[in-house]
Amino acid sequence: MFVFISFSVSYADEVNDLLNFYVNKFKPEKALLVISDKPDKTGKFNDVYMELTGVVIEKLRLDSLVVRMRGVQFNEPKEWKQGNVKCSEALSVLATSTILEKDINKSIADRTFGKGDGEWHDLMLRIKPEGLSGSGYYKFSILDIRIDIDSKLKVVKGKELWLDEPFVRVNKLDIPDYVTNKALSRIQPLVDLRKLPLPLTLHKVELKNGSATLSSRKLPEALTKGLKYTYTK
């Protein structure tokens, strides 16, 4: 359900089309879009704030995604109604996203679990303030290898979360390093936001019990004045 909260303006339908695109793209449970003023005819906004809950990116659920963009250029508004929305650039983009441990585990299971050679099963990762730990089984030839992992985490290329200097233990001492390296490569990156259609770059990760938060160097602040659009699933 969409709700437009503002005074009556002729371009409300255009911005509703914009929100509709992100709702269809991300399948959020809730969404809030706030704009400082109307877009110009080229699709440029002065200031945009977006707050999404329960976003799905490539089958990975993000518990939250918050973005503040200034001087942001979209394609022409007349194209938005057809679901053609492109965000090409912005003068400033601040963002933060929190991903829950259970959603990372589900995403990895969907991507890597199986019974064949080179596949994982029963892998469970745990996130704590000091880092990540976990264990699972990796199929290599006729072997079913138990692998234990302890690792820090790092942001890579502005949109990915990777293991950082992982320490690995296996239940068979004669397993060569290339096997464990291959096993780890199957679950990397843990989080991949490259398909996120926004020009954002994340720089840091903060870990809490059961969650990881990726953020830009500065956190986005809410846009308190402007035209507000909301969506609830």
Give residue spans per PLM region:
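Bacterial N-terminal signal peptides
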Residues: M1-S6
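Extracellular/lumenal and peripheral-membrane lipid-interaction modules
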Residues: S10-K233
